[in-house]
């Protein structure tokens, strides 16, 4: 159960991308991605740790065109999760902040990227945590 470091989709305990990949490997991944596809933003999207009502996605690493907006990315994630239109869904950057839906991914990347070069986002059904 909780000792299963390989991750369990049944229990919902899945190690984060940062836990699975050391910093230098993540940084190398981004360097390769950006050199091969400079118009794409490398994004990691994972389910918020305490989230239980939204499903897990089949993958967490995405290459997003830099010209699309956060709202367009939310639509893509919503479709991948197969959510109903009325189902609550929020994307938080760096597990803490909501950003403007009209912000482009290139602006988000320049403002919020991690030192390893990825933008980290989590999805949740709750906008704030108390």
UniProtKB/Swiss-Prot annotation:
It comes from the Eukaryota. PANTHER family: MICROTUBULE-ASSOCIATED PROTEINS 1A/1B LIGHT CHAIN 3-RELATED. Belongs to the ATG8 family. It comes from Caenorhabditis elegans. InterPro entries: Atg8-like (IPR004241), Ubiquitin-like_domsf (IPR029071). The keyword Membrane applies. Ubiquitin-like modifier involved in the formation of autophagosomal vacuoles (autophagosomes). When lipidated mediates tethering between adjacent membranes and stimulates membrane fusion. Less effective at promoting membrane fusion than lgg-1. Acts upstream of the autophagy protein epg-5 in the aggrephagy pathway, which is the macroautophagic degradation of ubiquitinated protein aggregates, and preferentially interacts with autophagy proteins and substrates containing LIR motifs to mediate autophagosome formation and protein aggregate degradation. This is Protein lgg-2. Its main location: cytoplasm. GO terms for cellular component: autophagosome membrane; cytoplasm; cytoplasmic vesicle; plasma membrane. A lipid is attached at residue 130 (Phosphatidylethanolamine amidated glycine). One of its GO terms (molecular function) is microtubule binding. May interact with vps-39. Interacts with lgg-3; the interaction is direct. Interacts with atg-16.1 (via WD domain) and atg-16.2 (via WD 5-6 repeats); the interactions are direct. Interacts with sepa-1 (via the LIR motifs); the interaction is direct. Interacts with sqst-1 (via the LIR motifs); the interaction is direct. Interacts with epg-2 (via the LIR motifs); the interaction is weak. Interacts with atg-7; the interaction is direct. Interacts with atg-3. The interaction with atg-7 and atg-3 may be required for the lipidation of lgg-2. It is found in: Cytoplasmic vesicle, Autophagosome; Cytoplasm; Cell membrane. Changing residue 26 to C: In bp556; defective degradation of protein aggregates during embryogenesis and early larval stages with an accumulation of sqst-1-containing aggregates in embryos and up until the L1 stage of larval development. The keyword Disulfide bond does not apply. Keywords: Autophagy, Cell membrane, Cytoplasm, Cytoplasmic vesicle, Lipoprotein, Membrane. Changing residue 130 to A: Diffuse cytosolic localization in 500-cell embryos with no punctate pattern of distribution which is in contrast to wild-type. Disruption phenotype: Viable with no visible defects in development or fertility. Embryos contain an increased number of endosomes. Lysosomes have a reduced capacity to interact with autophagosomes in embryos and furthermore, there is defective autophagosome degradation with an accumulation of lgg-1-positive autophagosomes in 500-cell embryos. Double knockout with rab-7 partially rescues the defective lgg-1- and lgg-2-positive autophagosome degradation defect in the individual rab-7 and lgg-2 single mutants.
């Amino acid at each position: 159960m909780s000792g299963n470091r390989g991750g369990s989709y049944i229990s919902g305990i899945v190690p984060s991308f940062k836990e699975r990949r050391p910093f230098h490997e993540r940084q190398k991944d981004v360097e390769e991605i950006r050199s091969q596809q400079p118009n794409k933003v490398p994004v990691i999207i994972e389910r918020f740790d305490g989230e239980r009502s939204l499903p897990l996605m089949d993958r967490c690493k995405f290459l997003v065109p830099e010209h699309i907006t956060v709202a367009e990315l939310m639509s893509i994630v919503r479709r991948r999760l197969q959510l109903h239109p009325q189902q609550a869904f929020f994307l938080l950057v760096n597990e803490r902040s909501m950003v403007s839906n009209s912000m482009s991914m290139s602006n988000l990347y320049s403002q919020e990227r991690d030192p390893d070069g990825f933008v980290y986002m989590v999805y949740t059904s709750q906008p704030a945590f108390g």
